[in-house]
Every structure is written in structure tokens, then in C-alpha cells.
Amino acid sequence: MPPTKLAHLVYQTNRMAEMRDWYCAVLGAHVIYENKHLSFATYDDEHHRVAFLDFGPLAPRDPAATELGVKPVEQPGLHHVAFTFGSMGEFLDNYVRLRDLGIRPFFCVNHGPTTSMYYRDPDGNRVELQIDNFATAKEGQDWMLSPAFDRNPIGVEYDPDELVKRFRAGVPVAELLVRD
């Protein structure tokens, strides 16, 4: 039986305050409990959705670091975490709020099943904020079996400011979500 929701994420970090502040800003969360070594935050009725642990110095995580003179490669571990918004308006309002705080996505893409914006937190972890492009999971799954998805399973990049402009101009959401 599958889970019914994402319960929480826990990050071990050397920058607890910076990580906490970043996630609280991005998710509209607030701290439930915090001490010198840990912080718990939530954005809904769950006791905590995101937690941060600081139990002492960790080796810095630098995506650009090299070892033995070779180009770095992805290492095992968390690739990204995704959070879904309930509507295009909420999704884009959140983008504008974050943009105005100086938090900008590094990759914006219409995957087909979702329209997504990818961010990096202060430790370099990837965070995907998304909306579903279909009314039901079945419709999204069916689209993933289409020739269009087979030709390009990653998706089509978009400019988030242009998407905001089109949305505010009254372009129907269904039209904004279309991906060839």
C-alpha cells in the first residue's frame, strides 16, 4: 500500500539557521520547535514537514568541488524533493514572492504531467516546486505514455516571468499548461 502523503524531510547541515530560513521562506512555513541542534518547521497541520539537524561540523558539500583533478559527478543520495501547489495562481504567486526575496529557480520546465521550478537550498539540495498539469493522476499517467513524452521525457523550458505575465493577462490555465 502506498503512502498517502509526504510526511517530512530531514536535512543534516552545518548551516541550520540559513537552511531553516530558506525553507520557511520557500514553503511559507513556520518553526514549531527549535534548539541549538535541531529545528522543526511546518506549513500545514502536520507537526513537522521539514527538520534540520546540526550535530557538529560536516564536510562541506560543494557541487563544484573536484577530486583527483576529475570533473565531479553526481553522488548517491537525495536528488531532489518536490512539493505540489494546488493551483496555477498559488504556484505563480509563490514564484513572485520568492523572486522578490532574491530566491530564483535555476531550471523551469513543463514536464508534461507537471509544470515545475527547481531551486537550490543553501546546502545545494535541489527542491522542485510544481503544479499538476492534469485534473487526475490517471490523465497524467496516460500522457506519460504518449509519443510526445516519449520524444522528450524531460520537458520544455519556460520563462517564469513570461508565464506570470500571460497568467495575469487572463490566458486560460489550460492553455498555459499545454506541452507539445
Language-model segments: which ranges?
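Vicinal oxygen chelate
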Residues: 4, 14-18, 75-126, 131-137, ...
